From Swiss-Prot:
Keywords: Chloroplast, Membrane, Photosynthesis, Plastid, Thylakoid, Transmembrane, Transmembrane helix
Subcellular location: Plastid, Chloroplast thylakoid membrane
UniProt keyword Membrane present: yes
One annotated Gene Ontology cellular component of this protein: chloroplast thylakoid membrane
Function summary: Seems to be required for the assembly of the photosystem I complex.
Highest taxon above the source species: Eukaryota
GO biological-process terms attached to the record: photosynthesis
Protein species of origin: Cycas taitungensis
Protein's name in the database: Photosystem I assembly protein Ycf4
Length: 184
Protein backbone atom coordinates (compact mmCIF):
# COMPACT_ATOMS: atom_id res chain seq x y z
CA UNK A 1 0.00 0.00 0.00
CA UNK A 2 1.57 3.25 -1.07
CA UNK A 3 1.04 6.74 0.29
CA UNK A 4 0.59 9.57 -2.14
CA UNK A 5 -0.13 13.28 -1.96
CA UNK A 6 0.22 16.09 -4.46
CA UNK A 7 3.95 16.54 -3.81
CA UNK A 8 5.05 13.28 -2.21
CA UNK A 9 4.84 9.60 -3.17
CA UNK A 10 6.08 6.93 -0.73
CA UNK A 11 5.88 3.30 -1.76
CA UNK A 12 6.84 0.68 0.86
CA UNK A 13 8.68 -2.36 -0.47
CA UNK A 14 7.95 -5.82 0.91
CA UNK A 15 11.15 -7.70 1.58
CA UNK A 16 11.62 -11.32 2.49
CA UNK A 17 8.73 -11.40 4.99
CA UNK A 18 6.25 -12.96 2.62
CA UNK A 19 3.87 -15.84 3.19
CA UNK A 20 5.62 -17.91 0.52
CA UNK A 21 8.99 -17.50 2.26
CA UNK A 22 7.49 -18.51 5.62
CA UNK A 23 5.97 -21.62 4.02
CA UNK A 24 9.22 -22.55 2.26
CA UNK A 25 11.25 -22.08 5.43
CA UNK A 26 8.83 -24.18 7.53
CA UNK A 27 8.58 -27.00 5.00
CA UNK A 28 12.34 -27.08 4.51
CA UNK A 29 13.01 -27.01 8.26
CA UNK A 30 10.62 -29.83 9.16
CA UNK A 31 11.58 -31.93 6.13
CA UNK A 32 15.30 -31.64 6.77
CA UNK A 33 14.80 -32.23 10.51
CA UNK A 34 12.93 -35.42 9.61
CA UNK A 35 15.75 -36.57 7.33
CA UNK A 36 18.34 -35.84 10.01
CA UNK A 37 16.39 -37.65 12.76
CA UNK A 38 15.81 -40.71 10.56
CA UNK A 39 19.53 -40.83 9.76
CA UNK A 40 20.44 -40.56 13.46
CA UNK A 41 17.78 -43.17 14.30
CA UNK A 42 19.38 -45.61 11.87
CA UNK A 43 22.75 -45.06 13.58
CA UNK A 44 21.38 -45.51 17.11
CA UNK A 45 19.06 -48.38 16.16
CA UNK A 46 16.17 -46.67 17.99
CA UNK A 47 13.13 -44.88 16.62
CA UNK A 48 13.47 -41.19 17.47
CA UNK A 49 10.33 -40.48 15.43
CA UNK A 50 7.56 -42.82 16.64
CA UNK A 51 5.62 -42.63 13.37
CA UNK A 52 8.56 -43.70 11.18
CA UNK A 53 10.35 -47.03 11.54
CA UNK A 54 14.07 -46.59 10.94
CA UNK A 55 15.02 -50.24 11.59
CA UNK A 56 14.84 -51.05 7.86
CA UNK A 57 17.29 -48.26 7.00
CA UNK A 58 20.95 -49.21 7.23
CA UNK A 59 23.26 -46.51 8.53
CA UNK A 60 25.77 -47.19 5.73
CA UNK A 61 24.95 -45.80 3.12
CA UNK A 62 21.31 -44.63 3.52
CA UNK A 63 21.57 -43.26 7.07
CA UNK A 64 24.70 -41.27 6.26
CA UNK A 65 23.09 -39.78 3.15
CA UNK A 66 19.92 -38.90 5.06
CA UNK A 67 21.99 -37.21 7.80
CA UNK A 68 23.90 -35.27 5.15
CA UNK A 69 20.69 -34.13 3.40
CA UNK A 70 19.17 -33.25 6.77
CA UNK A 71 22.17 -31.13 7.79
CA UNK A 72 22.28 -29.40 4.39
CA UNK A 73 18.54 -28.67 4.61
CA UNK A 74 18.90 -27.28 8.13
CA UNK A 75 21.64 -24.91 6.93
CA UNK A 76 19.50 -23.69 4.03
CA UNK A 77 16.50 -23.37 6.34
CA UNK A 78 18.50 -21.30 8.84
CA UNK A 79 19.58 -19.02 5.97
CA UNK A 80 15.92 -18.51 4.98
CA UNK A 81 14.91 -17.82 8.59
CA UNK A 82 17.73 -15.26 8.92
CA UNK A 83 16.59 -13.42 5.78
CA UNK A 84 13.05 -13.37 7.16
CA UNK A 85 14.24 -12.18 10.59
CA UNK A 86 16.41 -9.40 9.09
CA UNK A 87 13.70 -8.57 6.50
CA UNK A 88 16.24 -8.42 3.68
CA UNK A 89 15.05 -6.46 0.65
CA UNK A 90 12.43 -4.37 2.43
CA UNK A 91 12.46 -0.59 2.36
CA UNK A 92 10.74 2.21 0.51
CA UNK A 93 10.81 4.37 -2.61
CA UNK A 94 10.22 8.06 -1.90
CA UNK A 95 9.55 10.59 -4.64
CA UNK A 96 9.51 14.14 -3.22
CA UNK A 97 8.50 16.68 -5.86
CA UNK A 98 8.71 19.61 -3.45
CA UNK A 99 12.43 19.04 -2.78
CA UNK A 100 13.06 17.50 -6.23
CA UNK A 101 14.65 14.38 -4.74
CA UNK A 102 14.10 10.64 -5.20
CA UNK A 103 15.21 8.38 -2.33
CA UNK A 104 15.43 4.58 -2.57
CA UNK A 105 16.07 2.70 0.69
CA UNK A 106 16.56 -1.07 1.18
CA UNK A 107 17.61 -3.26 4.08
CA UNK A 108 20.29 -5.85 3.39
CA UNK A 109 22.23 -8.47 5.30
CA UNK A 110 23.97 -7.38 8.52
CA UNK A 111 27.38 -5.89 8.04
CA UNK A 112 28.95 -2.76 6.66
CA UNK A 113 26.41 -2.33 3.86
CA UNK A 114 23.24 -3.25 5.80
CA UNK A 115 21.44 -0.11 4.66
CA UNK A 116 21.33 0.85 1.00
CA UNK A 117 20.25 4.44 0.50
CA UNK A 118 20.27 6.03 -2.96
CA UNK A 119 19.39 9.67 -3.66
CA UNK A 120 18.84 11.26 -7.05
CA UNK A 121 17.59 14.57 -8.30
CA UNK A 122 14.27 14.35 -10.10
CA UNK A 123 15.60 16.40 -12.99
CA UNK A 124 18.18 13.62 -13.66
CA UNK A 125 15.48 10.99 -14.22
CA UNK A 126 15.05 10.52 -17.96
CA UNK A 127 12.39 7.81 -18.24
CA UNK A 128 10.60 4.88 -16.66
CA UNK A 129 11.48 1.66 -18.49
CA UNK A 130 9.42 -1.50 -18.59
CA UNK A 131 11.12 -4.81 -19.36
CA UNK A 132 8.58 -7.43 -20.41
CA UNK A 133 9.53 -11.00 -21.36
CA UNK A 134 6.69 -13.43 -21.83
CA UNK A 135 6.96 -17.20 -21.99
CA UNK A 136 7.23 -20.09 -19.57
CA UNK A 137 8.90 -17.88 -16.94
CA UNK A 138 7.60 -14.35 -17.56
CA UNK A 139 9.76 -11.45 -16.39
CA UNK A 140 8.30 -8.00 -15.81
CA UNK A 141 10.50 -5.33 -14.24
CA UNK A 142 10.21 -1.54 -13.91
CA UNK A 143 13.41 0.48 -14.20
CA UNK A 144 14.19 4.12 -13.61
CA UNK A 145 16.60 5.54 -16.21
CA UNK A 146 18.90 8.14 -14.66
CA UNK A 147 21.26 10.43 -16.53
CA UNK A 148 24.87 9.22 -16.28
CA UNK A 149 23.96 6.11 -14.21
CA UNK A 150 22.79 2.61 -14.90
CA UNK A 151 19.08 1.77 -14.82
CA UNK A 152 17.73 1.16 -11.32
CA UNK A 153 15.05 -1.52 -10.83
CA UNK A 154 11.91 -0.36 -9.02
CA UNK A 155 9.72 -3.46 -9.17
CA UNK A 156 11.33 -6.75 -8.21
CA UNK A 157 11.19 -9.86 -10.37
CA UNK A 158 9.42 -11.85 -7.62
CA UNK A 159 6.57 -9.36 -7.39
CA UNK A 160 4.55 -11.18 -10.11
CA UNK A 161 2.56 -8.20 -11.35
CA UNK A 162 0.22 -8.74 -14.25
CA UNK A 163 0.98 -6.80 -17.40
CA UNK A 164 -1.98 -4.50 -16.73
CA UNK A 165 -0.86 -3.75 -13.14
CA UNK A 166 2.68 -3.11 -14.35
CA UNK A 167 1.50 -0.71 -17.06
CA UNK A 168 -0.73 1.09 -14.56
CA UNK A 169 2.10 1.42 -12.02
CA UNK A 170 4.50 2.71 -14.71
CA UNK A 171 1.90 5.18 -16.03
CA UNK A 172 1.12 6.56 -12.55
CA UNK A 173 4.79 6.98 -11.73
CA UNK A 174 5.61 8.56 -15.10
CA UNK A 175 2.66 10.94 -14.70
CA UNK A 176 3.79 11.91 -11.19
CA UNK A 177 7.39 12.48 -12.32
CA UNK A 178 6.31 14.04 -15.65
CA UNK A 179 8.56 11.80 -17.74
CA UNK A 180 8.10 9.28 -20.55
CA UNK A 181 7.74 5.49 -20.49
CA UNK A 182 9.96 3.19 -22.56
CA UNK A 183 9.22 -0.49 -23.20
CA UNK A 184 11.89 -3.02 -24.11
Amino acid sequence: MNWRSEWLWIEPITGSRRTSNFCRACILFFGSLGFFLVGISSYLGKNLIPVLSSQQILFVPQGIVMCFYGIAGLFISSYLWCTILWNVGSGYDKFDEEEGIVCLFRWGFPGRNRRTFLRFLMKDIQAIKMEVQEGLYPRRVLYMEIKGQRDIPLARTGENLTLREMEQKAAELARFLRISIEVF
